[in-house]
């Protein structure tokens, strides 16, 4: 039984490693392009009236569920203006009454997400009622899946649009520069008008080709057009003179990401072009799986940027609190010294400087962001890239029991997973004092000497 299980695992690993690179369609030829008009004329799809009738029958069969979807969508739509007003009101007070609080920023992020929900809820409801009880290989199911995928693309786009709106979270709370906000807004609008239509058409046709094989070439051509459109959008978004890269160079010229933009910028732009080529060459399955990974990667970067913005906002709030506390301590020391006739300038030597706290915590935040990105990219891409799966077969060393049985194996993939852990440990040991001061010690009734001793002890704990 164990031998059979081992053989099954070997076959499963072989399939996972090589299935992605098996050609699933014939390459698109020039003759196929010339016959596209004839193919579309012969393609018999159900009329719109029949699809609408099927949708309505599913709605009337489940009236209470349909009413719940409708009420939720209408409620979110009616509250849209309320959400926007709350975001604007919080943003206007973020440097005033809320200057030393992080909670308003978290509230604004929640209101931003809520403001993006109404249209997505409507799309999801239509897709669910149309496809939930449809035949697996039917036009209704293909349209439902197309709407569902378009909704999945739309929701994060709409959240991003709400984040970068005037007086939004990105501007007022995160301090994103105009050099970043403007190209992001242009890219979101471009994808919203054109990209979502192409996403729906590509998904619908790629699914429909399993029913009508003759439209396979048309489906892959539409997919290739979508990928080239995304490549063009990324080209303009990451432009070195007017895009996000220009903003990155202006705000963080010494960061590792800014210094290496000549590597990652052309690589990111080339990925959709390669996917278009794969689809046209007949590797439609591989192109589809890699597109999902590309989609996840883009929103991993956006989510990481939002988390970094929240962390930077927390750091700013903490610095203000620490500055206020240190000012109060200095005033108290000065008053005590004046009352006793002692020198006040020697009584606060152990007080940690704000510049040191800021520098150490910034290093920790940036290192954490890079580690999250690296770990996320590894998790997203490892299932679809045989090169990464192949790392598990590179054995660096093994531990043997006295009878010669292998007890444990260390592969190259284990080392690559361990490296981020070692890096974060090094960063924690080096920057623990600033993090503790900003996160915990400012809230405790400790004097400067106790804070210094506690910082030292905890640094040793991380080291060992």
Regions found by a protein language model. Give the residues of each.
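N-terminal targeting peptides and non-cytosolic leader segments immediately upstream
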Residues: 1-50, 55-59, 71-74, 343
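Short helix/loop segment immediately N-terminal to the Walker
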Residues: 325-334, 442-452
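Hydrophobic/aromatic interaction determinants used to assemble and anchor large protein complexes
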Residues: 53, 57-419, 423, 427-430
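Active-site proximal loops enriched in glycine and acidic residues that flank catalytic Cys/His/Asp
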Residues: 420, 424, 440, 458
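Active/binding-pocket-proximal capping segment
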Residues: 393-398, 437-447
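A short secondary-structure junction motif
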Residues: 94, 435-443, 461
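Conserved structured catalytic cores and adjacent interaction surfaces
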Residues: 441, 449-464
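Internal alpha-helical transmembrane segments of multi-pass membrane proteins
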Residues: 142, 146, 448-453
